[in-house]
Structures are given as C-alpha cells and as structure tokens.
From Swiss-Prot:
Pfam families: PseudoU_synth_1 (PF01416). This is tRNA pseudouridine synthase A. Homodimer. It catalyses: uridine(38/39/40) in tRNA = pseudouridine(38/39/40) in tRNA. Substrate binds at Y111. Belongs to the tRNA pseudouridine synthase TruA family. GO terms for molecular function: RNA binding; tRNA pseudouridine(38-40) synthase activity. Formation of pseudouridine at positions 38, 39 and 40 in the anticodon stem and loop of transfer RNAs.
C-alpha cells in the first residue's frame, strides 16, 4: 500500500462536519466516495487531522489515505479535485512514509474566526462570518485575548461532556485584528491542539468582554476556576475556519 497526505479546503455550510456519520453529509464520506470510484470500487478509508463541526470551514485541513498502487501526485490531486463535489478543493497531495498519521504526527493548528459587526448585516456572508451588530471595544478584547497565550488548563472553555481527560493545551498565538473598513474582526489562534468547541467558547467570551458585559480579568478567572459557567456563550460555527496545520520535520 502507498500512503498519501493531502491538504484540502472546504466550504462547511452544507456539511454536518468532517467526520463520517450516518444519515448526514460529511467531508470524509465525500472524499472516500471519490477515492473509491478512482480505485475501481474498492473502498478507501480517509483519516483527518482535525474533526471540524457542522458549518465549520477549512482552508488547510490535512488528510491521509492508502492506495494499493503508486500514482503521480499531481495526476492524483487533479483527479480527486475534479471528481470531488464543488464545495471541496484538493490543494496538494504528496507521498509520505507508511507510518505517517495526519492526526497523531506531532503538529500545530491555526484557526481563524471571522465576526461581521456591520449594520445591516451582509446576507452574502451569513454562512461565512458570525454576525455581532453590537458595540465592541476592540482594545479591551485585544488585551483579554493575550491572556489566553501560553500553557493552561482550558477546562473552562470546553464543552461539557467531553471525554478528553487532559485539558492542558498550549496556545502560541492569540490575536485580534480589524479590517480597514472596521466591519470585520478576525480572531487567530495557533497551538498544539484545541478542545471541543474551545475556540468558539473563547470567542463568545471575548465578544462579551468587548461588549462590556464581562471584565477583561474574566479570562484569568475562567482559567483559574476551570468553570465553563463563568465563560461566555458558544459562538456560532459559521465564522470558524481551520486555516493551517503544520507538522514538525
């Protein structure tokens, strides 16, 4: 068997998430169906580095799969790209070692979250940015977001019921920029891994801080007390993008 690593992007609006699930459309299943057709009906299993939720987009998701034969990477990329649905794009494909695993190989992820604070909202962006048409103090949020950098126990920012026991993660970058129009905000988070709904919960909290409904120091309190009830609401998924996955050499 020959193992391939692929970088893909997708519009998450019409998917129930990356991971295959019964009675719902998923990115994993669509790519597996295309690869199975290319493999003359023999089933191919796809593994993903990140399991994005329903409505979440990806600019640089990484997958791997095995084929029973070796094929030129560009020809394979072209075939997979052109035969996949329009809301999936295959950016690149490369041969990798047989023991490479896109999820378990050491890597870091970067996510971006886009907020549209325009009035009225732009209906063309409704699936690609979370609308928040309320007053926001950007400087307060920029101070608060830096408190998330470093190694912390992020229990207070994860969804209840998660099966992950170790909730300590390292965030190497947490930043917020505003575009030149002042309408769109982009939150960026890079780190060695993120808990279930962690980014959306952090953004929901930062928006509350920006709206003066929580103090800047609320971030410190949430990290100290590890209490989800102290954090803000979970931001909608439509503003979230898996931007990039970087593997260590």
């Amino acid at each position: 068997m020959t193992r391939y690593k692929a970088t893909i992007s997708y519009d998450g609006y019409a998917f129930a998430g990356f991971q295959r699930q019964p009675h719902a459309r998923s990115v994993q299943e669509e790519i597996e169906k295309t690869l199975t057709r290319l493999n003359k009906g023999q089933a191919i299993t796809v593994h993903g580095a990140g399991r994005t939720d329903s409505g979440v987009h990806a600019l640089g998701q990484v997958i791997h799969f095995d084929l029973p034969y070796q094929m030129d990477e560009e020809k394979l990329r072209f075939a997979l790209d052109t035969q996949s649905p329009e809301d999936i794009d295959v950016i690149s494909i490369e041969l990798v070692a047989d023991d490479f695993h896109c999820r378990y190989a050491k890597h870091s992820k970067t996510y971006e979250f886009t907020v549209d604070r325009g009035r009225p909202k732009n209906p063309m962006r409704r699936h690609y940015a979370t609308h928040f048409p309320y007053p926001l103090d950007v400087e307060r949020m920029q101070i608060a977001i830096k408190k998330l950098e470093g190694t912390h126990d992020f229990t207070g920012f994860t969804a209840s019921g998660t099966s992950v026991e170790d909730k300590v993660r390292t965030i190497t970058e947490a930043s917020l920029i505003v575009d030149e129009t002042g309408q769109f905000l982009t939150f960026t988070f890079s780190g060695n891994g993120f808990l279930y709904k962690q980014i959306r919960n952090m953004v929901g909290t930062l928006l509350k801080i920006g709206n003066n409904r929580m103090p800047v120091e609320q971030i410190d309190l949430i990290l100290e007390k590890k209490d989800r009830q102290l954090a803000g609401p979970t931001a909608a998924p439509n503003g979230l993008y898996l931007k990039e996955i970087r593997y260590e050499e």
